[in-house]
Amino acid sequence: MELSVYNIKGEDTGKKVVLDDSIFAIEPNDHAIYLDVKQYMANQRQGTHKAKERSELSGSTRKLIRQKGSGGARRGDINSPLLSGGARVFGPRPRNYTFKLNKKLKALARRSALSYKAKNNEIIVVEDFNFDAPKTKAFKAISAALKVDEKKVLYVLPEVNKNVYLSARNLPNTNLILANLINTYTVLASKNLVLTERSVAVVNELFKA
């Protein structure tokens, strides 16, 4: 698969870049995507939720009313789950939500997500980002030139670039990621992907089947 390469002014440079078909042109596996996104979301959870059960509450254990004869429901002490302010039955306990997936499935999910983006023409390739100093205004102009300024966009960089990061961090709907850290969730969470030529080379090398 070939895509045109644009400059930061949004102009077609006439150059082409090759996207590896084993990454960007496979038949997407929706179930692999589902499992990988589910794992990503689960791994973000802290799992620190906690509600006190009956044995953990302080307070009197005196029975509030006698067992029979009142005409009302039976009830025990003030911590009874039947009462307002009482304990909770089977409340949440601290737990670890993380789970593992095998590497082949995660790789398939990542390639499936990238193939969806390529199939929907949601991948843009630019020559490079050159910033001598952090300039949010300049980065915003690039987004406008590429016509992605009103959409959620993920910029894929080949390496850490402090000036690019500082220029983009305050822009809404704009995220940055290193090419070697691309994952299924971040790809699908954005409408468009913007890669540099070097980013494409990194992705082609690391993720080819």
Curated annotation (Swiss-Prot):
GO-annotated molecular function: rRNA binding; structural constituent of ribosome
A Pfam family per the record: Ribosomal_L4
GO BP terms, alphabetized: translation
Endpoints of the signal sequence: none
Entries under InterPro entries matching the protein: Ribosomal_uL4, Ribosomal_uL4-like, Ribosomal_uL4_dom_sf
Disordered: annotated segments: 45-80
Keywords per UniProt: Ribonucleoprotein, Ribosomal protein, RNA-binding, rRNA-binding
GO cellular component: ribonucleoprotein complex; ribosome
SUPFAM superfamilies in alphabetical order: Ribosomal protein L4 (SSF52166)
Assembly information from the UniProt record: Part of the 50S ribosomal subunit.
Summary of the function given for this chain in its UniProt record: One of the primary rRNA binding proteins, this protein initially binds near the 5'-end of the 23S rRNA. It is important during the early stages of 50S assembly. It makes multiple contacts with different domains of the 23S rRNA in the assembled 50S subunit and ribosome. Forms part of the polypeptide exit tunnel.
HAMAP family reported for this sequence: Ribosomal_uL4_B (MF_01328_B)
Entry-linked PANTHER family: 50S RIBOSOMAL PROTEIN L4 (PTHR10746), LARGE RIBOSOMAL SUBUNIT PROTEIN UL4M (PTHR10746:SF6)
Protein family: Belongs to the universal ribosomal protein uL4 family.
Name under which the protein is recorded: Large ribosomal subunit protein uL4
